[in-house]
Amino acid sequence: GDAAHAMVPFHGQGMNCAFEDCVALARQLDAHADLATAFAAFEAERKPDAAAIQRMALDNYLEMRDRVDDADYLLQRELELALQARHPGRFVPHYAMVTFMRIPYSLAMARTDIQRGILERATAGHATLDTLDWPAIDAEVHALLTPLEDVPG
């Protein structure tokens, strides 16, 4: 899976990505009698998600290599879990979106970028969750993130 998609294997999504490609290709072949049109539609549909999972896999490697013992990173992970509990379905951790939900990789990446920004802004200059401005954080979550549901395959 990962080899077929020319991505590093640090997100474990190669086979899943390949299965998603199969479903998308079958859908496009059913929708278009002309093979060139079907393949062009398939590429347009899947290329953004392939690029997204490639970036997320590399980001995951860099995170595991460089950040897992960083105090700022650990505080952000702690806040991530707290926000998941405070805003279920709205603040969904990156790993959960990619691994346990059927949403496009490109959507997971875009939401991860937004959520990472929330985490970084909220924890800047803090060493503990006790000193955070929870009303401001909750307001930002509601302003930037809509509720997320699984997308049917």
For each of these PLM feature ranges, what is it?
Residues 20-23, 77:
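A structural signal for well-ordered alpha-helical segments within the folded catalytic domains
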Residues 9-21:
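A conserved FAD-binding loop/helix module that cradles the flavin
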Residues 1, 16-19, 36:
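Alpha-helix initiation and capping sites
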Residues 27-153:
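C-terminal helical "tail/cap" subdomain of flavin- and related membrane-associated enzymes
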